[in-house]
Curated annotation (Swiss-Prot):
There is a cross-link at E16-Y20 (Pyrroloquinoline quinone (Glu-Tyr)). This is Coenzyme PQQ synthesis protein A. It comes from Pseudomonas fluorescens (strain Pf0-1). Keywords: PQQ biosynthesis. Belongs to the PqqA family. One of its GO terms (biological process) is pyrroloquinoline quinone biosynthetic process. The keyword Protein transport does not apply.
Amino acid sequence: MAWTKPAYTDLRIGFEVTMYFASR
């Protein structure tokens, strides 16, 4: 990904994606 924000943003997105797939 090409995020210019701090690393915690990428970590949060990864968490969001994980929860998204987990709730499918």
